[in-house]
């Protein structure tokens, strides 16, 4: 098992890359190179830990684990006319572990790609669907205060582009592990309700929405090859001219 977290050009040892590092490369190849290169070791500053979303993810996993064990459909799925069952597999806990995840050794580049899924559901034909949990606050119409429908529209919400890339990476990893994987992934949105609520009273109520997304991971292969080429270079790449981190460092 590879132990190095920084890459040395020309190394023979397989090198691990998490899903988040693939995201980093897509966002800015310069930031990625500075972060992973043994010659630089310059990481982007980290943000604060999101403890409440993490807690919601944990509780959702506990709920779906009950239905995984019983091989039953969760009521959330029934509410959305989905007859999908949480996938039961000996490695599911490892796949959901951020330090382990589902892995694939890309032999042509000697890179080990991995990522921790939130969940995986199966249909009646044992075709797998990647599932990702997202927690947020409900969006309301400013005039009527009616709750707006959750969507994956990126307009005004560019982070949702990365939601999509995230599940596409997981779809690719599962397929490379010889599972039959659907292009259709699902996002389970837990939206906290706060308008028309009299007081906190030490609790929040949530609206659950399940949104489907048809992924396309055909970009993965070329991206992996480009990642390896970047790691092997002794030159810092140009990166993304719109990268705010590079602008802050004054290196663009």
Language-model features: where?
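Metal-dependent nuclease catalytic regions and adjoining charged, substrate-binding loops involved
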Residues: 1, 16-17, 173-252
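Conserved catalytic cores of phosphodiester-cleaving nucleases, focusing on short active-site segments
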Residues: 28, 113-153, 165, 169-170
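Short histidine-centered catalytic/ligand-binding loop motif
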Residues: 49-52, 141-161, 206-213
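Metal-dependent nuclease catalytic cores in nucleic-acid-processing enzymes
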Residues: 153-185
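Residue-level signal for well-ordered alpha-helical scaffold segments within enzymatic catalytic domains
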Residues: 35-36, 63-66, 119, 129, ...
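A structural signal for short, well-ordered beta-strand segments and their strand-loop junctions
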Residues: 33, 121, 129-133, 182-189
């Amino acid at each position: 098992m590879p132990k190095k977290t920084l890459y040395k050009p020309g190394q023979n040892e397989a090198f691990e890359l998490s899903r988040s590092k693939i995201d980093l490369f897509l966002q800015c190849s310069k930031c990625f190179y500075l972060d992973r290169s043994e010659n630089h070791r310059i990481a982007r500053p980290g943000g604060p830990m999101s403890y409440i979303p993490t807690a919601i993810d944990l509780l959702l996993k506990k709920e779906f684990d009950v239905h995984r064990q019983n091989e039953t459909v969760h009521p959330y799925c029934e509410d959305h006319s989905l007859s999908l069952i949480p996938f039961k597999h000996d490695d599911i806990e490892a796949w959901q572990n951020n330090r382990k995840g589902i892995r694939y050794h890309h032999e042509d580049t000697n890179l080990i790609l991995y990522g921790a899924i939130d969940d995986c559901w199966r249909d009646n034909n044992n075709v797998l669907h990647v599932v990702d949990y997202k927690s947020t606050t409900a969006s309301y119409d400013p005039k009527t205060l009616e709750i707006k429908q959750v969507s994956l529209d990126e307009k005004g919400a560019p982070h949702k582009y990365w939601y999509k890339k995230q599940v596409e990476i997981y779809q690719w990893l599962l397929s490379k592990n010889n599972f039959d994987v659907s292009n259709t992934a699902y996002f389970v949105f837990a939206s906290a309700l706060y308008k028309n609520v009299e007081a906190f009273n030490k609790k929040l109520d949530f609206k659950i929405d399940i949104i489907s997304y048809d992924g396309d991971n055909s970009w993965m292969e070329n991206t992996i090859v480009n990642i390896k080429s970047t790691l092997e270079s002794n030159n810092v790449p140009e990166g993304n001219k719109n990268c705010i981190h590079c602008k802050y460092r004054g290196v663009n």
